[in-house]
From Swiss-Prot:
Catalytic activity annotation: 3'-dephospho-CoA + GTP = GDP + CoA + H(+)
Pathway: Cofactor biosynthesis; coenzyme A biosynthesis
Database matches in HAMAP family: Dephospho_CoA_kinase_GTP_dep
Family indicated by similarity: Belongs to the GTP-dependent DPCK family.
Pfam family, one: DUF359
A biological process term (GO) from this entry: coenzyme A biosynthetic process
The protein's name: GTP-dependent dephospho-CoA kinase
Signal sequence extent: none
Alphabetized UniProt keyword annotations: Coenzyme A biosynthesis, GTP-binding, Kinase, Nucleotide-binding, Transferase
E.C. code: 2.7.1.237
Binding-site list for GTP: 40-42, 59, 112
Amino acid sequence: MLRLPDEHRALFRNPFGTLYPEFSMVLPHLAGRAIYTVGDVVTANILAAGILPAIAIIDGYTRRLPCPPALLHQARQILVKNPAGAITDELIAAIGDAAANPPALIVVEGEEDLAVLPVILAVPDGGFLLYGQPGEGAVLCTVDQQAKERAREMLALFEQV
C-alpha cells in the first residue's frame, strides 16, 4: 500500500488538468474520447449527460457526506477497500482490470480521491480523466505521456507501507 505523507498533501490540491467551474463547460470537450471518472458527483453528472464512462470510481460520499449511488447498469461492479490518504494494491489491481475490460464501476469502501494517479497510468493515451475539485468545479485531464510522467512524479512522493 502507498500512503501520502502529510507534508505532501498540499500538492494534491492543485488541479491535475483544466478546472471548469461549471460541469456544463466540460461537456463540449468530451466527444469521441474514452472518459474515466473519479468521484460520485462527477460520475453522476456524466451519466446524466448520457455518457457512459469506461471506468467510474466512486465511494458513496461527496465532501464527507453520503451521496446517492451512481447507477451504471451497463457496467460490472468491482468492490475494493482503500483508506483515506492511501492507494492500496487492491485499488490498483481493480483499476488495471477495469482498464482491460471496460466499462466498469469501482466502488470504494473508504476514499477514492487519490485514484486519479493510478487511473492515469493504467489507461491508454488519448482519453479524458474527469474528477471533482470540491467547492471549485470539475477537472478535465487529457491522458497523455506528460500526464503519466506527472502521475509517476507524484506517486514517488508516497511511502510504501
